[in-house]
Amino acid sequence: DKSDTTNAVVQAKPLCFNQLWDMYPHTTLEASGLAVGLPEGQMGNSEVGHLNLGSGRIVYQDLTRITKDVESGEFYNRPVMKELYEVAKKQSLHLIGLVSDGNVHCSLDHIKAVIKGAHDNGIEHVYVHALLDGRDVAPQCAQGYLKDLETYMADLNCGKIATVSGRYYAMDRDNRWDRVELAYNAIVHGQGEIATSACEAVQQSYDKDAADEFVLPTVIDAAGTIKDGDAVIFCNFRPDRGRELTKALVLPDFDGFKREPLSIYMATMTKYEDGLP
């Protein structure tokens, strides 16, 4: 639409592009929502675009498939989830995930679904290791999502936030292991910044002019660290930024930084990589 004042290409008035448009057959593509296998109204992203273009057809995304599974109840019947809850009954359940409604890497609704399953299975010790966004959503909006999650858990009387960490640390994808190590140490060893609540941890970061993605790994509840025998689920459905922390938690020959191997049951929302849960 050449009258679209929000379209940068239109506003640039590119002579060559406009000539091609006027002289040759052309069409347009939808890049969001149901047209690319996402929920209605959900924006697309690079991974979604590449997958649909390369496939030449609509590919229903992990976000959509998992959401449908949750709505139908099939989510809780999957063997991995059943095993996760069975192991957690003996000790503790830990959820790691990006707490926002950006829906690019993780869905807050999926995190809530796992917590509801824990409640329905009578699991007493449920801890959330909240990763903060600030990239797929506004730079400083984490407190709203954290309060929403805390309210949900309080209503169920199930779960508490044990640690928070900006995605800059916990969701690195370029082998910058010094960042991942900080997140790992908070989640496993209870080492890092200290705060009495998740929102306080975020505010401490804001006071230092650091937005959500740069919140230093912070311990809220030292009793909520991952220990041998615990059950862990990484709730991110997009693999690329979940791999490194997962490797640190489960690979026996991990060499990104020094740490003692854990004996845990770990699941991930999707297959991150061959050799990982």
Predicted regions and their residues:
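Short hydrophobic-aromatic micro-motifs
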Residues: 53, 234-235
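Flexible, charged surface loops at secondary-structure boundaries
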Residues: 88-89, 226-228
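Active-site nucleophile/metal-coordination loop of metallo-enzymes that catalyze phosphate/sulfate
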Residues: 2-168, 178, 182, 254-277
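Conserved beta-strand elements of the Class I
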Residues: 94, 231-233
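Conserved phosphate/oxyanion-binding catalytic-loop motifs
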Residues: 238
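Long, well-ordered, tryptophan-enriched scaffold segments
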Residues: 137-227, 234, 242-261
